[in-house]
Amino acid sequence: FRISNSGWGENYETTHSGAKWDTFLANCEKLADYRQELRPAMLVEFFFHIYSHNRDDFSRIRDLCDRLGFTLRYRHAALAPLDNVARVDNGKQISAAAVQTRQLQFLSVEEVMDIARRERDRPCYYLDHVWIDWDLSVAHCMEWYDPSLILFDDFLTVSPEEIYAARVNSRHCRECMARGIHRAYCVYGDEKLIAAKSSIPVQEEQ
């Protein structure tokens, strides 16, 4: 079970539109209680997304996870979806909401793509994962939201081999990997980079 979080109190509400911190915290505590009652062995991963405004919240988030028995993960906050990363990399306009996200990011798209381009020859993580939407349609990739990238309308009518072949041989995937965009979210999640940039005080634990 995975939980997404971007800070404590008002900082959480800043990057989770319409969300309320008190409700989020109460739900985390309920989840911990239900897990203890029904399935104590269930893994709960708590993902803390590092922005420029929430870095000081990390110690409280860590204490919360320790108290509830959640496994704490952390990563630099990404600009999603990859459509937006590609637009920034191409110098194209992005939405006002995406601009706001960029202003809050601790690790910029430019920094990420500089590293990702150097890793462009490394494999694409997403080729091993199939994105099936609620309507059974299959997209090229779980990280690209462009509706024109739907490969098949019904997951139940095609084989895994057909899906894999359509993605690997597609122009979209070739171009994405040639530019290194497929590595962008791996860079955002690089914990060694987080330590190197002192993004959060995790070094104190080592």
Go through each PLM region and give its residues.
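Iron-sulfur (Fe-S) cluster-binding modules
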Residues: 204-206
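Radical SAM enzyme [4Fe-4S]-AdoMet core and its adjacent flexible, acidic
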Residues: 1-174, 184-202
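Conserved core architecture of multi-subunit DNA-directed RNA polymerases
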Residues: 178-179
